[in-house]
Amino acid sequence: MSIAASVIAHIAPVPAQAYAHPMPSNRWSEMARGVAADESARPAQVVAALGTPAVFARNSEIFGDDQVAENVYVVVSGVVRICKLMGDGRRQIEAFCLPGDAFGWETGERYRFSAEAVSECRLVRVKRSVLFARAGSDPELACALWALSFAELQRAQEHLLLLGRKTAQERVGSFLLDLARRSGTTNASHVTEVTLAMSRQDIADFLGLTIETVSRTLTYLEEQGTISLPSSRRVLLRDRSALRRLDS
């Protein structure tokens, strides 16, 4: 069972606005135990068991750059962008967080980036003070924190390589493959579909490209038969081998 399915099953429908409320600890404990079949989701579930659910509307701010870093968040559903606004108005998106990802890790007292809901998001908000206080005596939690931190570091390293050395086609190809790996669905014809919750501008700001270059590259890949674009939010990966060559 995925983290999204496990957590959503325990949260009643709520209005699309930012708020949080506590959930009885026994229900969170049951939720955390219920995902043993999916070991990849286990670290996020261990951390989520200590938090409270929160819902953020599309394009709302979860926390701002330089705010006091009180919480770590686990994504249950939706997509979150981690971004930085430069002094001249340019924006760099550092990461897109999907269900099962955690964000808000800081070594200092304040957040160095902003976090915003790309779509309506269901999150679990966990106090940093609670995590650090319990990690010293809870080996499972300590291992979960290590695993989630390492996953974030790995994504950051891959993003650095993408920005520093790859061409526009390679960047877009790598981006689509990463989304397919993390959230894609494959049909009976073995075609993987990726849903783009983010806008073309979001993608451009993540890949360090212009929106025009992103659009041209997607069109080129479609003309080559590598992908299909049934709509602006749907991408079908028809030739993953070709994309993998771009990603190598």
UniProtKB/Swiss-Prot annotation:
Keywords: DNA-binding, Nitrogen fixation, Transcription, Transcription regulation
CDD domains named in the record: CAP_ED, HTH_CRP
DNA-binding region(s), chain positions: 200-219
GO biological process, one term: nitrogen fixation
Induction cue: Oxygen is involved in the regulation of fixK expression. FixLJ strongly controls the transcription of fixK.
Organism domain of life: Bacteria
Keyword Transcription regulation set for record: yes
Cellular compartments per GO CC: cytosol
HTH crp-type domain span: 166-241
Pfam families (alphabetical): cNMP_binding, HTH_Crp_2
Presence of the UniProt keyword NAD in the record: no
InterPro entries: cNMP-bd_dom, cNMP-bd_dom_sf, Env_Response_Regulators, HTH_CRP, RmlC-like_jellyroll, Tscrpt_reg_HTH_Crp-type_CS, WH-like_DNA-bd_sf, WH_DNA-bd_sf
GO molecular function, one term: DNA-binding transcription factor activity
Free-text function comment from the UniProt entry: FixK is a protein that regulates nitrogen fixation genes both positively and negatively. FixK is a positive regulator of NifA expression. FixK may bind DNA at the FNR consensus binding site.
Full protein name: Nitrogen fixation regulation protein FixK
Organism per entry: Azorhizobium caulinodans (strain ATCC 43989 / DSM 5975 / JCM 20966 / LMG 6465 / NBRC 14845 / NCIMB 13405 / ORS 571)
Phylogenetic classification of the source organism: Bacteria, Pseudomonadati, Pseudomonadota, Alphaproteobacteria, Hyphomicrobiales
